[in-house]
Amino acid sequence: MKRIIYSFYIDIPEDELDIFDRDVLKKDEVPRNIITKNEFKYNYFKLLANKKWYAESIGVPFMMFEYDLRYQKFEKEVKKYYPFITTYNVVNFYKLNLLYELSKTYDEILYLDFDVVCLTKDNFFNNWNLDKGIAVFDNTFKVNTMETITKQTQTIRSPTAKYYNAQAMLMEKNLSPINKVINTGIIGANKEHLNKLKYFDDFDNDIKTMKNLTTNYDVFPKKIVDFFGYDNETLFSVKLNEHNVPVQWLDNKWHYFFDRQGFIPKETKFVHAINKKFDVCWRRYYA
């Protein structure tokens, strides 16, 4: 059984950052993308060392991908055919492209977003039998009801936006709109289920559908459609449903969604630092 753990980091140029939270920012508040860019730079070596430490502790090789020729080629290709897709979304499609590239060599793969901090030496692969399905986190609990949505309650990256965007795509495919909001910050998968997912098999048509839906008000009101976009997690949810792919939901121990809580529970194994408060993560790590 060949296994691999990998992560990925691109320092997106400031002039290519999309200020997606403009409408929810308070006066003098720094946009989330700027905070992310700065915190990744400041914590780069610690974040990299942490993932290497975890991989070594469970005896699995680790690979780090960054701004190399392979990424540049992918970005150039995507922006050539889909110039309306932001660099942020290109980056997130690429991390899934890497999943497929690695599946050509490895049987089981664990992907960790660069803002994930490992707090355990417990072996992910021994705790999650990937023959049972792709292991991801269910973010549906963060979805707002349609009547409560305003420009101030969400952004284009909010779970709410992804939920209704996936509904719209599924309906376009004449499928049930029932879906889960997937978070792709941590993914455990094997070759068999990735092949069944067929994430990139119909990519051109999927992106065209997503583009058409950004201006289609036939089913959803404008206040919903205005938040539709080209998110990798939206498409991931659609593909899980479209191809009936087995899935198992990571619990809070293995994917702790660290956002506004201000603390990390003792039993946590992987912290996904959405808020980029790495100082809290390091205090927990070194405790």
Identify the role of each PLM range.
Residues 16-39, 74-86, 144-173, 210-222:
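Charged, glycine/proline-rich intrinsically disordered loops and linkers
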